[in-house]
Amino acid sequence: MALLRLFSGRKASAPVARERLQILLAHDRGLCGQPNLLGLLREEILAVVSRHVQLDPEKVVVRMDRGKSVSTLAVDIELPNGLA
């Protein structure tokens, strides 16, 4: 049986279930547990992008639209001239 699983190319069910659970937990925590989630996301995104590009922190806008079944995260970063 183990030999068949080796060649089947399918993931084992435990890692897939764990990944799905982590996604659900992250989504639930964002909906009810962290009032400053957008601020935290903005700061982390700003830190990552700032490693590669010098930019004005005031020109980074993060928005989250939450629907019943889907949440959307939008990030607008104004880059200096010559980089786009």
Curated annotation (Swiss-Prot):
Q: Does the keyword Protein biosynthesis apply?
A: no
Gene Ontology BP term (one): regulation of division septum assembly
Domain of life, per lineage: Bacteria
Q: What keywords sit in the KW lines?
A: Cell cycle, Cell division
- In its UniProt entry, the species of origin is given as Rhodopseudomonas palustris (strain BisA53)
**UniProt keyword DNA-binding, yes or no:** no
What job does the chain carry out? Prevents the cell division inhibition by proteins MinC and MinD at internal division sites while permitting inhibition at polar sites. This ensures cell division at the proper site by restricting the formation of a division septum at the midpoint of the long axis of the cell.
> According to its UniProt record, which protein family does this protein belong to?
Belongs to the MinE family.
Name of the protein described by the UniProt record? Cell division topological specificity factor
Q: Which InterPro entries match?
A: MinE, MinE_sf
**HAMAP family, A to Z:** MinE
